Amino acid sequence: MALRRGGCGALGLLLLLLGAACLIPRSAQVRRLARCPATCSCTKESIICVGSSWVPRIVPGDISSLSLVNGTFSEIKDRMFSHLPSLQLLLLNSNSFTIIRDDAFAGLFHLEYLFIEGNKIETISRNAFRGLRDLTHLSLANNHIKALPRDVFSDLDSLIELDLRGNKFECDCKAKWLYLWLKMTNSTVSDVLCIGPPEYQEKKLNDVTSFDYECTTTDFVVHQTLPYQSVSVDTFNSKNDVYVAIAQPSMENCMVLEWDHIEMNFRSYDNITGQSIVGCKAILIDDQVFVVVAQLFGGSHIYKYDESWTKFVKFQDIEVSRISKPNDIELFQIDDETFFVIADSSKAGLSTVYKWNSKGFYSYQSLHEWFRDTDAEFVDIDGKSHLILSSRSQVPIILQWNKSSKKFVPHGDIPNMEDVLAVKSFRMQNTLYLSLTRFIGDSRVMRWNSKQFVEIQALPSRGAMTLQPFSFKDNHYLALGSDYTFSQIYQWDKEKQLFKKFKEIYVQAPRSFTAVSTDRRDFFFASSFKGKTKIFEHIIVDLSL
């Protein structure tokens, strides 16, 4: 009985072992089929698939090479090959995908060769190749790539060779980063041919001279808002510091600001008090700093900076009998002598030139009376000194400096320009221009043609009180202030030789625009008669970003 039970137990165990033995090769065969699909050819170290619609899902092993040819999947998704961490070579040729997503090759820390050739790729995400720090060879040849995202190769620290042939690159601003990268990389890169824009067609990207002009523009952004009204702004440098003097008639102040190199803004430095101050003009003579403070009431005065008091103190009065309604102060030099002129807009006013005599300023010449002058501008015309006076009662007149009498004498006028509020001069490429501001009608831009000033452009300017030219490096602008609508900034178009509209800014009742540069930054003060004074910063915008 026991023997029978023992025999049956041995027989059962034998049958169980035989059954298990029979099952082992079947399981191994199933696993082999799962590891190598019908569309693929597999060895211990490599897989080649033709016409596959998916990436083989194979248990991680020693697979070091994967080739997918004529595949039908439409994109390379993130971490699409992460289940094959031992890959050293990945070939993706003649497939249907059009896009490579971010982190498409994440997890392939040992990948050295990546060939993505002859596909239909149009888009590559910025972080598509992230993590491929051991990659030495990359080919994107013969795809439909028109542009590559900035820094797409930034993770490829070991890259030796890059092939970009056979694509359709648009060599516009989007290619600027690639242009710069090609100049700096130590990798060997195939020629990148441009199919556009037309001026670069069939050229090599490396042969493009520069993208600086096409791919940069400028802008004005609000940097600082000053909580007070103002009518004029002047700037001056003293002992390597930059200062700004702001006339505030409603607050009866001439506020002096200084540039704070730490906080990077303009802060209060000193305050000159007065009555209805309409102008603060700085004059630097040797190491001395003076400020002419023009007032509507109580006479105008000159202040001098006192080092011991570290503030401006009254230095001199300007005769009330000569200047009763100052409207503009203009500083100039002739034969190393310092002058300034005050334009008087009262009916019986005398626009007067003042001269420095080493002890103070004295009235040097009365220009004319009864004309209600609104502005004075010193201009060098063909090497000769001139003053242009604008007036509410006549066209702008031109006075020329007489070297014999050392006085200004009438020389001519600017015809057909009645009711001009202000005249400003500026130069571009050694050519002299004038901007003439009119409150009603069109303001004008004029050019000197060696004989006379001729009009080159009319700017609609209803309610304009100022048309101010200013420049930052090679960028030339006109700021047209308006009491009725947005103020306009115009930029000079070198090709058309005209000013074109560039930007609208909102400033309530603007009265002056002043350019100030410091710490390699450029600013633009906009005074406001009815609102807050604004400081705009002139910035360079890279269109390739």
UniProtKB/Swiss-Prot annotation:
LRR repeats: 86-107, 110-131, 134-155
Signal peptide from the UniProt entry: 1-28
Taxonomic superkingdom: Eukaryota
PROSITE patterns found in the cross-reference section: EAR (PS50912)
Residue span, LRRCT domain: 167-217
Entry's localization field: Secreted
UniProt keywords, alphabetically: Glycoprotein, Leucine-rich repeat, Repeat, Secreted, Signal
Start and stop residues of the EAR repeats: 219-261, 265-307, 311-358, 360-403, 407-450, 452-494, 498-540
Glycosylation sites: 70, 186, 271, 402
InterPro entries, per the entry: Cys-rich_flank_reg_C (IPR000483), EAR (IPR009039), EPTP (IPR005492), Leu-rich_rpt (IPR001611), Leu-rich_rpt_typical-subtyp (IPR003591), LGI_related (IPR051295), LRR_dom_sf (IPR032675)
GO CC annotation: extracellular region
Main location: secreted
Gene Ontology BP term (one): inhibitory synapse assembly
Domain LRRNT: 29-65
Tissue expression remark: Brain, heart and placenta.
Function (record text): Required for the development of soma-targeting inhibitory GABAergic synapses made by parvalbumin-positive basket cells.
The protein's name: Leucine-rich repeat LGI family member 2
Gene name per UniProt: LGI2
